[in-house]
């Protein structure tokens, strides 16, 4: 069975324990290098597609080759929780293949790797809760992110990449405080916090 031809999965559909994942994403940030006890280098990279962002853990020399703006196809990856955060891994036999640069529609929000106490509750309640959550969030993906941000970039820090603002779209407590924050070391968050007033104006 050739898993390279398996269907792609969106970042929003990644859940802990899923294996043989095929995902296409754009690299947004490369984290600092950490070394394991046995000498391996590990990088945590923030990646995104049109449905949201997630952290991927990349080991050794491959991590040194990845650059922000690279569009990459992951084959045979898997997802797991690490320190309470959903993380994507290449896995055994997994591959990262660069298929382009820069030109990809993506959304940084929601960040599925942020610690989310609600997710632990959903995990314990089982599939019924997941289905209820999915039906409530069914217009989120491209439908909610596009119109809420309306394609309007606010502030001088706007990037050429299309990304939008989720606001309170998923009800997670940790995303809203970040949208209201104005930390100087988070230029993207500055852009998002400036987007709050125009959204109110569009609703009127």
From Swiss-Prot:
Compartmental location: Nucleus
Signal sequence residues: none
Region (Disordered): 114-187
Coiled-coil features, chain-numbered ranges: none
DNA-binding interval(s): 26-99
UniProt-listed CDD domains: SoSSB_OBF
Keyword terms of this UniProt record: DNA damage, DNA repair, DNA-binding, Nucleus
Gene Ontology annotations for the cellular component aspect, listed alphabetically: chromosome, telomeric region; cytosol; nucleoplasm; nucleus; site of double-strand break; SOSS complex
Principal subcellular localization: nucleus
Segments of skewed composition (Polar residues): 121-142, 177-187
MF-aspect GO terms: DNA binding; RNA binding; single-stranded DNA binding
Protein origin, superkingdom: Eukaryota
GO biological process: one example: response to ionizing radiation
PANTHER family named among the record's database cross-references: OB FOLD NUCLEIC ACID BINDING PROTEIN-RELATED (PTHR13356), SOSS COMPLEX SUBUNIT B2 (PTHR13356:SF5)
Similarity comment text for this entry: Belongs to the SOSS-B family. SOSS-B2 subfamily.
Record's function text: Component of the SOSS complex, a multiprotein complex that functions downstream of the MRN complex to promote DNA repair and G2/M checkpoint. In the SOSS complex, acts as a sensor of single-stranded DNA that binds to single-stranded DNA, in particular to polypyrimidines. The SOSS complex associates with DNA lesions and influences diverse endpoints in the cellular DNA damage response including cell-cycle checkpoint activation, recombinational repair and maintenance of genomic stability.
Quaternary structure and partners: Component of the SOSS complex, composed of SOSS-B (SOSS-B1/NABP2 or SOSS-B2/NABP1), SOSS-A/INTS3 and SOSS-C/INIP. SOSS complexes containing SOSS-B1/NABP2 are more abundant than complexes containing SOSS-B2/NABP1.
Name of the protein: SOSS complex subunit B2
């Amino acid at each position: 069975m050739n898993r390279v031809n398996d269907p792609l999965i969106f970042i929003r559909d990644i859940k802990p324990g899923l294996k043989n994942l095929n995902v296409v994403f754009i690299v947004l940030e490369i984290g600092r290098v950490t070394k394991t006890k046995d000498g391996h280098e590990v990088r945590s990279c923030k990646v995104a597609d049109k449905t949201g962002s997630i952290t991927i853990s990349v080991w050794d020399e491959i991590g040194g080759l990845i650059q922000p703006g690279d569009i990459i196809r992951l084959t045979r990856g898997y997802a797991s929780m690490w320190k309470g955060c959903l993380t994507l891994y290449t896995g055994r036999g997994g591959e990262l293949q660069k298929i382009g640069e820069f030109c990809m529609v993506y959304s940084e929000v929601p960040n599925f790797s942020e610690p989310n106490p609600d997710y632990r509750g959903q995990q314990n309640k089982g599939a019924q809760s997941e289905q209820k959550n999915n039906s409530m969030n069914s217009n989120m993906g491209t439908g909610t992110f596009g119109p809420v941000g309306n394609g309007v970039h606010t502030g001088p820090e706007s990037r050429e990449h299309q990304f939008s603002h989720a606001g309170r779209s998923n009800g997670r407590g940790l995303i809203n405080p970040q949208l209201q924050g104005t930390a100087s070391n988070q230029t993207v968050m500055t852009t998002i916090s400036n987007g709050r007033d125009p959204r109110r104006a569009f609703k009127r």
